[in-house]
Amino acid sequence: MARTTPISLYRNIGISAHIDAGKTTTTERILFYTGVSHKIGEVHDGAATMDWMEQEQERGITITSAATTAFWSGMSQQYQQHRINVIDTPGHVDFTIEVERSMRVLDGAVMVYCAVGGVQPQSETVWRQANKYGVPRIAFVNKMDRTGANFLRVVEQIKTRLGGNVVALQLPIGAEDNFTGIVDLVKMKAINWNEADQGMTFTYEDIPAEMLSECEERRAMLVEAAAEASEELMEKFFEAGDLSEEEIKTALRQRVLAGEIIPVCCGSAFKNKGVQAMLDAVIDYLPAPTDIPAIKGINEDESEGERHASDEEPFAALAFKIATDPFVGNLTFFRVYSGVINSGDTVYNSVKQKRERFGRIVQMHANKREEIKEVRAGDIAAAIGLKEVGTGDTLCAQNAPIILERMEFPEPVISVAVEPKTKADQEKMGLALGRLAQEDPSFRVHTDEESGETIISGMGELHLDIIVDRMRREFKVEANIGKPQVSYRETIRTRVNDVEGKHAKQSGGRGQYGHVVIDLYPLDAEGPGYEFVNEIKGGVIPGEFIPAVDKGIQEQLKSGPLAGYPVEDIGVRLHFGSYHDVDSSELAFKLAASLAFKAAFAKANPVLLEPIMKVEVETPPDYVGDVIGDLSRRRAMVNGQEATEFVVKINAEVPLSEMFGYATDLRSQTQGRASYSMEPLKYSEAPTSVAAAIIEARKAK
């Protein structure tokens, strides 16, 4: 099959917004206008196109959100047909890994702002992420029909609060109830949408006389921004005082792709005004896959490799989201960076080092899904029934393996016990948790050997709340949740030498005999976490028993002698011991090693480590004193403040155990006007009084 849309006509975009800015309505309207102008034809092979939404409503599960394909030829059909893949960006920036991944899958972004609320604290976080990954973007100021809407104020906020070099492409005609349309400053024409057909049709008109001078002023700023793209244009601009429409668009595109400017559009998605003009801006100014640098990865020999957006290169794709569908199983959404793959082909999962067969491949369109036979560079699609693929895995050609995303998932810092409410829930819960863990690699599940409880662990209270909520909504599993438990660690502070461990049972029959002498010493926290050095000389312990000594110690690390928490940052040097020709065995040396380790650990000044979170609070200036006072009561170390006119950002390091319930407390202190984010930072030694209480509580269990 030949390529139907040239890759230069692709736009892989994310729509990202603060909660109240109207992201959902904007996305719906995009699908409405593109879906109406492009009816999906009869699906090849006579397979019926299945109505996806109906199933979704029955199941209460949103599958369409990960990525949707739409087609757009421009408001006036002025372009060749472009293919726009809209990728959902996670609403929650707490999970950096998710935001990071969606930023990798996008080529460009549309930032949606509310014309009343403007730039909110959460908008800053998403903006910083987009800066970090160099994502070109345009802005859409939505809700121009709302009371208090002010387009130019929001444009100014993007400039002052986010540091964006903004260029207004449009001006609104009226605002609030009187918002009737927009002025296109490139064409210098007013656009009015027809309310009778939900804005499907529109007319170009002359600019209202009372707006003419303001439009001319803004147009001059726009042309100057375009002229700065090159010296030739600058000269032409100085001589003629203007540039052609074509020159303006080409120059602005060049500057957007270089990350130098942010074009801004406006409208009201709810009132069906301005969305098509914003789609035109997506085509005019945001990059095709061929406009962005080749994606980098790691080859099999650990050297750096890359893949260009071309069908000719070896196949490489990134699995960026796994959606669970109770009927078809796993849907793995993936972005193809290079090459071509057909349904039925076998690919290589370079992260898990396993082969997978691509069965059915589907693409989502507005509210339909279409089975397709092949995908090519630049495409975004979903595969049904891949068995072992996890979020962030690379799928590639078997003869050209590459890893596109080095996934180093942070270790979970908080755990809770979950208990199914009924026997029926018990069976479903295991399945549900397994599926959710496959989707989200920063979430873990295990069974506590002592209590038999199921323990779930994740990156914070909110993270686990969302998991439990999804378990109830998507899998219909009701469960009781225990109190949050913090994942502490144990380590040592001083070195101890020549500690022996002897396991000897020699009373009749075959005995057991193992004897080791070790040194135990602390390792740097940045290091490997554990090292084992064998310095046995002269065969005092035969070589075949050395791995058993290492294993005996490693088994002790899972549950430390102090309070049963994992032990880290320790090194062991095995340098002496003895054995018995008949009675020595692997088991005997394993037991001897564990005895030596326990004895050495007790003498090596053992300490308890607690997880410290990096906390960032954004609050209006009036509440700074209350917020800092409250953080200090939580044993926080406040590292500094940054103030802008509207918001003060407080950076602090706080023990996780003190952060439970913080969201509620912060809301009540600041009348709901502050927000915070936190992420794991490091482990630090817990104060003696805190450690003593924790150890006591563990022993009482």
UniProtKB/Swiss-Prot annotation:
GO terms for cellular component: cytoplasm. One of its GO terms (molecular function) is guanosine tetraphosphate binding. Disulfide bonds: none annotated. NCBIfam families: EF-G (TIGR00484), PRK12740.1-5 (NF009381), small_GTP (TIGR00231). PANTHER family: RIBOSOME-RELEASING FACTOR 2, MITOCHONDRIAL, TRANSLATION ELONGATION FACTOR G-RELATED. HAMAP family: EF_G_EF_2_B. This is Elongation factor G.
